[in-house]
A protein has these predicted regions:
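Positively charged n-region of N-terminal signal peptides that target proteins for export
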Residues: 1-7
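Formylglycine-dependent sulfatase
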Residues: 2, 13, 17-497, 503-516, ...
């Protein structure tokens, strides 16, 4: 066994056995239950203590934090759904595994972590959102949603029938939980398991389960202090994005107001079609629950004729109310899975990991969505519990990243980490230790432009105090020539591009090539770009060197 991995595992599991003996004793190889939500912000988990979550608590996720370790500084390497999932599966950065963007790209010749877990004797399964354009590799069992999936009565395909989707009646979060429990019920009891539970929730457009619709009606969530940000002191990327709650959230689709349909407007028609795509799947009982809340709310909104800041605040409040109503089902799911483990005497030998594919804006800077290297979307929640091996109720502030997840899985399984994986197993941190060579900085790279939200391509490096970001690339439709799959007819990337162009989505964005520098100690909200300011020469030089070192070491190929 690789000595570094052995040192990480043995103190944690209190073992003194060689690799062969460890592989023969399943007690040394815990079960792994990995729960990942889509777009679940740290701000929406009460264990992290944000003002939003105090009004909409998550008691079951908090319960997990109380019995394990909560990470305050977990980050992603590319804040976008599919690239994040590809990183999880391969342990590689986006440019290494091919998945730079949302649709095409994943290099299926790369070894997937579940394949290595299988070889180590684990029974592997995944339920819920897969969202990669390839067949699940390395899984004994899968029961996955069709692409992004729908909240109501979604389509799933299962093991042996990849691509053959069938509709199932119910709510996506509840159905995903049901299939997770089915896997646990039917697994081979003489083998350890590794189960990925990937929820669609709380992805946009935030359709709550019938029993949770409107549960936060009347709750006034506090506005983030940066909600009215005007993006001064920053470059053009913060100004040309399309993820502003006030300007870019759609009244028909995001706020579920079909009464506002304008049949003469292509954007209105598109938004209405998206809403009907969800409402049209509902059963009469589901639609009745939806109508009971939204119809009177919509009437009140239309009669109020809000505009300006009043409209922006209304949008914010109802965005957060719907989002947190969706989270209520996620929290219940976590509770059900924890209860199952305890009831079946699996809780003591199961590592439970809770995270999200990336962070999300909950009104900070006036935004929703993710993509930027700014803190709210760069951060992601991470909570890990392993009773008897990880101290209860502890917090960790070391810098970790989602490229560390794959090595951590392998270390728990006693599998040597492939050399191509550059992440670090988290076992030393989980054991309360911090290796002297633990990272002092992180690399980030976002590629997906031009597409939804128009966030510009950028990469950067972050230390515990400073962050340097480089924005680059051609603007608007000129950027398509730099985008591999958008140039290939028939690809999902090309189809998306054509749709957005037809609906007049794109701006005439400028070509960009500029840096931003932030002092996170004195400016945690990243409102003041100090790049080029007097007194920053030394730290800028240090960060520039580190950024260029990363580009060279990782063989970044977009320059």
């Amino acid at each position: 066994m690789n000595q570094n991995i052995a040192k990480a595992i043995l103190p944690l599991a209190a073992l003194s056995c060689a690799q062969g003996k460890m592989l023969a004793q399943d007690v040394a190889r815990p079960n792994i239950l990995y729960i990942m939500c889509d777009d679940h912000a740290m701000q929406a988990i009460s264990a992290y203590g944000s003002p939003i979550s105090k009004l909409a608590p998550t008691p079951n996720i908090d319960r997990l934090a109380q019995r394990g370790m909560l990470f305050r500084n977990c980050f992603v390497e590319n804040s976008l759904s599919t690239p994040s999932r590809a990183c999880l599966m391969t342990g590689l950065y986006s440019h290494q595994n091919g998945q730079r963007q949302l649709a095409e790209g994943i290099d299926t010749t790369k070894t997937f972590v579940p394949e290595l877990m299988q070889k180590a004797g684990y029974e592997t399964g995944i339920v819920g959102k897969w969202h990669m354009m390839c067949k699940p590799k390395g899984f004994d069992y899968y029961h996955i949603l069709d692409g992004q999936g729908k909240y109501y009565n979604p389509n799933f395909c299962t093991t042996g029938n990849y691509g053959k989707y069938k509709q199932e009646m119910g709510y996506a979060t509840s159905l995903t939980t049901k299939h997770a429990i089915e896997f646990l019920d039917n697994r081979q009891k003489d083998k350890p398991f590794c189960l990925y539970v990937h929820h669609k929730a709380p992805h946009r457009n935030w359709f709550a389960e019938p029993k949770h619709i409107g549960i936060y009606d009347g709750v006034d969530f506090p506005l983030p202090k940066t909600f009215w940000d005007n993006y001064e002191n920053r470059g053009s990327a913060a100004k040309t994005q399309k993820m502003n709650i006030e300007k870019d959230m759609e009244l028909i689709l995001d706020f579920k107001i079909p009464e506002l349909l304008d049949t003469s407007d292509v954007e209105s028609m598109s938004s209405y079609s998206g809403l009907m795509g969800e409402l049209g799947r509902m059963t009469p009982a589901q639609r009745m629950a939806w109508d009971k809340y939204y119809m009177p709310r919509n009437r009140r909104f239309i009669e109020a004729k809000l505009s300006g800041k009043e409209l922006a605040v209304w949008k914010y409040q109802n965005y957060i109310r719907d989002y947190m109503s969706v989270i209520a089902s996620v929290d219940e799911s976590v509770g059900q899975l924890l209860d199952y483990l305890k009831a079946h005497d699996l809780d003591k030998n199961t590592v439970v990991i809770y995270t999200s594919d990336q962070g999300f804006y909950m009104g900070e800077h006036g935004w929703f969505d993710k993509r930027f290297m700014y803190e709210e979307s760069f951060h992601t929640p991470l909570i890990i519990s392993y009773p008897g091996h990880i101290k209860e109720g502890v917090e960790n502030t070391d810098m970790v990243q989602n490229i560390d997840f794959a090595p951590t899985f392998l270390a728990f399984a006693g599998v040597e980490q492939p050399k191509e994986m550059t992440g670090k197993p988290l076992q030393p941190l989980l054991a309360g230790e911090k290796p002297k060579n633990w990272r002092k900085d992180l690399y980030y790279h976002y590629y997906d432009y031009p597409t939804y939200h128009l966030v510009r391509k950028h990469d950067g490096v972050r230390t515990d105090r400073y962050k340097l970001i480089y924005f680059y690339g051609k603007g608007g439709m000129r950027a398509v020539e730099e985008n591999k799959y958008q140039n290939i007819a028939g690809t999902s990337e090309n189809n998306c591009l054509r749709y957005l162009y037809a609906t007049n989505y794109f701006n005439e964005d400028p070509d960009v090539s500029y840096y931003e520098l932030y002092d996170l100690q004195n400016d945690p909200d990243e409102l003041n770009n100090i790049y080029g300011k007097k007194g920053t020469e030394k730290v800028t030089k240090q960060l520039m060197k580190r950024l260029n070192d990363y580009r060279k070491e990782l063989k970044i190929d977009e320059y």
